[in-house]
């Protein structure tokens, strides 16, 4: 018998439940794909083998007296674990999985402790009453308890804590009622919102994707039920479209309003529609700006007035806006909440206090990076905004909630200093900067009577000790229940590999939602929300009903702990159980944010002392302004330099779980890097899922801001050496992905009695869809041997990648050393260097990009007439490109035939070639070199920030083209580099 921490009477009579309803009668390895049984009334989470340091069998079965077992559903179960209905399981604690150490992982990946073992977890669904007694009979002993003894904040602990039982919220699957045609696939559901009505019903709204389009849906869960309606959900947006996020609330007349953002006439605006119990009203358009209006939240006050906040771009800057609705006057005109002069403002949150005053929280990008702000609308007038946290750390995604005393509880997540600044491959870079997803933690504060305060116990202190891959608590959602108890719900990362360091691409992970409440003195242990596994940025929405109970809705993609991949996007809802009794008055103290610390340095890099306030680029704003002001006037046309990144992953990619969310990547591009464009290029294995590809393209449109920021549509087609990885860029939305054929994976051996299948099929696909491709990491195991080339569709190569290294040539600047395997990120294939392609006569321009992890240290520079998708893609086709690791201006031209030729162009001339060179660095230029046919033919050491000169080659051009390009290296600490695209010259 496993002993329990609390004593209780031993069972004298065991009556097995004989009336169980078995929804699934077959043994199954499925976990998160199995739906919760709607005819149960109690959910318990069982964890086996906590603290085990060896593989131990915990198989067993459940027995119930005065109640019934409805179903056992696996949760955290791995290969070999099984559920055998109706009441038996097979499960073991199993060794944690370690990522295999590759040569370049030396000094990065941590060794797993030999006693690192994973505990299986499963849910028990019961029909229970105060007399129900449960026995869990396991191979390690029995656990006996009364079902009502397991409450929130009071879990059952047995066998010295090796087996635990926790009360769980009862999950309700949303949007799957009614009968849809057999020929129709299920919708991919996402972006949930929740409202509780005065009569106790719960309304959920969400977006649903199917057949290349999505809509807004809603449905009502009646009070007292644990299942959605047996009817097809309401289609709030009446036709297929392109929608983003939802918000829902009830007005004074009992009408339920849904708001959403939708792309109409190539712009995102907010729309609203109300349901009076019989029919839906006409759709009302709430915004008419020429730039995106998205990221909205809505709440109702005690009078049934609705309050709406959102992020809207005006004149290329994001601001926070507010409007309201009442049944007499309808929707008001928008008011700007953030200051006119404020920088980009993001992600508003909203709460209403007991006096119907609205408080709006948001984060904005300033000199310190992202900071969080709060502003109240008291008695109809806006008070001055309050800077809640404005340190050198990244502070973002603020949420707010009012308690019964009108204190405003605030929660946000943080990361390190200089977020999104210089972070990348070179082993000598030691900038005081933080990558996009190096860390996340949650901080909580309280705004009370004009003062900023904090709980006496920091939220972080209550979280479990983190392993290498588990130090991520993020996207908090704060709420206050009817007992005046503050809660913080958050996303928590669970990696597939348990030794992955934050400097290494993480291969597969999931995030689950957990919640913790403040009991007046301390934060509770985190409590899991069921069916909450999913991608990084799936948001949790919660409201309080008239009885004080918290009601929540959340999306999930139902990924599991075996595969860690998107499976079936769904939406769930639940009433959240709380501890009984009124919460004590919270113990608070003055808010004292800890001092900022220097950025964490990768463990395998040189370490140096630095101040937390040390800037990365003190003159960055001026450098960016200079590069944007620079004009190429060539043959009667004007070209400008548009800075971007043509190769970026997020957590949608299978190896992108240390890259952060899609939205964080756009934040980085717009704010931290001040880019003009970006192409997020998820692996085809990430976006081959139809919904992920749709969502990826949706974000490209959401974050297009006039001509100031223009994302591009693209993905990465990942085929190993010798065919190689290539990024694909489209000038438009909606092209399909191309699958990878089996024999494209042939690495050169005649394993299947076939020669390797080359990329000809891929080249045909690019022609068909008017796309272009760019090889990258060409000198690695992801690269190419340059056996195949199509100049029409493959005009440019990624010469440098800040996640890894340079691929210009062997022994060139920043190239991987040929005799140092730990510095050969991704392997070493010298036949894939760009110089080899040039030697073959391939006419490839160059650009630099990031891939994974690296930020602010690789720029794809496009010379275009305007910042539009067509113009940018045309610049790539013409090879009007160069690559740089900093904001370096490179102007490299050939003067001949009474005109000038830009980099990337071809010229037939009769005289010796003459080149004009102009370079402006961000620091002193150390070396400026001209390379002809892979040989350096000219060099100078300017020792100043500018170089302006001409170079004439005394050798006349021949029949076969010679190519010339410029490369630059600065003399600053990190020796920043730039490469022009070549100019090809032949005799006339």
Task: Please name every model-derived segment.
Residues 36-83:
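Low-complexity, serine/threonine/proline/glycine-rich extracellular segments that form mucin-like
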Residues 129-133, 303, 547, 912, ...:
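Extracellular Ig-like/FN3 beta-sandwich strand-entry sites
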Residues 526, 551, 567-988:
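Extended, charged catalytic domains and RNA/DNA-binding interfaces, predominantly
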Residues 90-92, 100-119, 153-613:
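Extracellular, repeat-based ectodomains that mediate carbohydrate processing or recognition
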Residues 137-141, 555, 967-971:
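Beta-strand-rich extracellular modules
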Residues 143-154, 974-984:
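Edge beta-strands of extracellular beta-sandwich domains
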Residues 104-145:
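Low-complexity, intrinsically disordered segments enriched in Ser/Thr together with acidic residues
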Residues 1-12:
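N-terminal Sec-pathway targeting helices
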